[in-house]
Amino acid sequence: MTLNNDLPLNNIGFTGSGLNDGTEGLDDLFSSSIVDNEPLEALVETPTFASPSPNLKRDQIVPSNIAKIKVIGVGGGGCNAVNRMIASGVTGIDFWAINTDSQALTNTNAPDCIQIGQKLTRGLGAGGNPAIGQKAAEESRDEIARSLEGTDLVFITAGMGGGTGTGAAPIVAEVAKEMGCLTVGIVTRPFTFEGRRRAKQAEEGINALQSRVDTLIVIPNNQLLSVIPAETPLQEAFRVADDILRQGVQGISDIIIIPGLVNVDFADVRAVMADAGSALMGIGVGSGKSRAKEAATAAISSPLLESSIQGAKGVVFNVTGGTDLTLHEVNVAAEIIYEVVDADANIIFGAVIDDRLQGEMRITVIATGFNGEKEKPQAKTSSKPVLSGPPAGVETVPSTTTPEDPLGEIPMAPELDIPDFLQKRRFPRR
């Protein structure tokens, strides 16, 4: 974690290992009147962080490299998700599209593309056969490796069940891991109406991908049927799934990319997500006076959750709000999340100011190292999910654990203390 004294307070981040020297005053902020009455941005006028050492001149500071993040859409579904992210204005990320279908690649908005398996498929696609998709990726393995050079974090997105996405995504992940990238898979499981064959292929693809990524988030498309209106057109339903993919990527990348008074290091995120296995993703939106409670509750309890995040050992959560976002609201949201995760969880936290969210708050929670129990956390309140896209919706998406983990036990991230200023009501100091 690094201090940035020259940048505006549009992103605040804390890690479970505690804060930098000079932050002891944050505990007192929660009991002071400024918390309830002042927006979070105003607190920048109250210095609570240590200045750089006077013995080190500014021109002697070695600039750090910004973490390089890429999103790679594999197959038709993955490329559609990439198009959605680009259209939504996600910044600070390089987008790539990978497909066997040359015609589909001509319609992508991604600035960089790889047509895999040109000799094998002649640009005509995989015909819904994952074996063809896998062989195509193997044929173009060197090209995939070149596209990942110098990359720190890779998101691999695909629609499971088809040919290219199902077969090629695990190979892309394998190459990324070999090159030392933190590799996160965010994929969809098909709707039931897409047929048993596609569902079976999807499960096989998910199992193959699970063993090749650090963290895997699976979006069960079929559960969208329980929260979207019955009259929702088919195209809109798929768009909703694509937008959930986008929010998952952005919830993690914003913490790393957007500069602020205190920046969360890429190493902090890696500590939670490296070799974490399956993950649950929750996204909640709240508005009005109780927006913090509403957003946090929606993020951890939704009709889309297949299992509970109870006892999660690793958590990345991002709070986004307008310039009226207060420190008190951040604390309220954090306490709700801390109620359901492990007391010694390694927690990475970030707060982002977005002028478009005046009067609203959006929370993204990524939980890893959980027990995967089917019982959902009992929320004190709930909000009706609206899946029309941010910032007016609530979307919560889990991934599932495979029946038999090919890698055996999932190694947990190192356990770190929860920040004192957020956990003093919940957990005593050690």
Swiss-Prot record:
Region (Disordered): 374-418
Highest taxon of source: Bacteria
Gene Ontology terms: biological process: cell division; cytokinetic process; division septum assembly; FtsZ-dependent cytokinesis; protein polymerization
Any Pfam family matching the protein: Tubulin
Biological role: Essential cell division protein that forms a contractile ring structure (Z ring) at the future cell division site. The regulation of the ring assembly controls the timing and the location of cell division. One of the functions of the FtsZ ring is to recruit other cell division proteins to the septum to produce a new cell wall between the dividing cells. Binds GTP and shows GTPase activity.
Homology family: Belongs to the FtsZ family.
Name recorded for this polypeptide: Cell division protein FtsZ
